[in-house]
Amino acid sequence: MSTTQRKDDSHLFTSSCTRQLQVQEDRQQQEKYVIAQPIFVFEKGEHNFKRPAEDSLEETAEPEFTGFLRKRVRSSSVTLHTTDPQSQGVATLSQTRLRSSSFTDVPTFPPCRPVRKNNVFMTSRLLQRSDDMNNVEQGPPMRSSEQVLRPAVLQPSQTQSCQKAGTTFGPGALKSYKTKEKAEHEISEVGSSSSLLSENLPNARSSIQLSTDPCISEAPSGCQPKEDKCSFTSCSSDFVFGENMVERVLGTQKLTQPPLQNLSYAKEKTFKSVLKFPNAVSNSDSIENISLVESAAAFSSKPSQKCLLEKIDVITGEETEHNVLKINCKIFVFNKATESWSERGQGILRLNDTAGRECGTLQSRLIMRNQGSLRLVLNSRLWAQMKIQRASQKNLRITATDLEDDGIKIFLIQASAKDTGFLYAAIHHRLVALRSLAKQGDGGPAESQSDTALPQLNGESCDEDEDEIAQVTKNGSDPSRWSHRQSIVCS
């Protein structure tokens, strides 16, 4: 009896357990249909690891969950999804929030957005189903050329802008405005095609709002961009650059022009009405009619315009003087500090005579100008105490006054042998005459004026040899012989 009772008790126990399990399963199924499982969402980045998805689990889960898949994720907020049993897997969910946090947008499963194909939580059937649903919602596939996001163009009211353009800029501005409207119309067509793409892409909704409805153009002025405001204010302003230029010019002579009848024509022709160049227009018309060869021939046939300078008389101070000798030479000056010769310049040396105060007397001076620049290098008068010495056949040493400090310095004249001989004889001749005049003035025997005075040299040419000049220089101590001779220096 005991064994039979034990068997009955075990049978009753097992039956009661099975009944309890069935009741629990029924309750769970009812709760599953009424209340969906909570979904845990976290904001961290996706993990790169992958886990193989099993289709067998999905097949067992599909009859139980219409459109949901179990996931284990860390959560920061919990949401409750209620499904409609008649939807049969379509993701039309009404979310009821149980516990809120900082997150407001909680994704649903299966997601309504396009999902990557390498997602480990989406199996092949769910991916196929989501693609079919997206194709039904989006319609035919878009071309790659049409999937370019472009901002919508906000057009101002055409009536106001046309009136402003007509009043400010005249008839010429209406043509440019019409062309601008055509270009903006083409841009708006492209924007309308891109607005279709923005409806399908939710990412574009958050960044750019594409629409070409006329209601948006009637929105308040605060929503319009600043560029439209600036363009509208510039059109509405009455200021035109260059207007009334004649009134702003400060001058004694003002250009007079007839009163302008049409305001738009005046604003269009502001600069042309003030300045007129009739010569330039006639020249341009003639140039257009002439070919290139003819213009080149006319240019070459024109005589070259030479700049004719006026002749100016140069006053040197030598106009009243008589030139006796003129040679080309170099001149050096002796520096006592360094005991060396420094070149002063190269040019033409002149020996000039002038009539003295006393009748029959002469006054002479040496003048030298630098070649090229004609800068004055030497300007010294001959006096009785002046010394002259012939250092060599081509060099002649003299004492003369310096132009820099008005002091007496030693100069060296370097020239050809013939020019050096002529210069030495002419200077020595005049120095002897000056010394004799100085002796007579001190109280010496009075002699006739013709014997003591140095006769004025004749400017005519004379031909004498160097040997004769050398003889004169050797016997130059006798001044009486100089008074009876003519000029021995060629001019």
Swiss-Prot record:
Alphabetical GO biological process terms: intracellular transport; mesenchymal cell differentiation involved in bone development; negative regulation of osteoblast differentiation; positive regulation of myoblast differentiation
Stretches assigned to coiled coil: none
Matching Gene3D superfamilies: Pleckstrin-homology domain (PH domain)/Phosphotyrosine-binding domain (PTB)
Region (Disordered): 440-468
Record-linked InterPro entries: PH-like_dom_sf (IPR011993), Ran_bind_dom (IPR000156), RanBP1-like (IPR045255)
Subunit and partners: Interacts with SMAD1, SMAD5 and SMAD8.
Stated name of the protein: Ran-binding protein 3-like
Gene: Ranbp3l
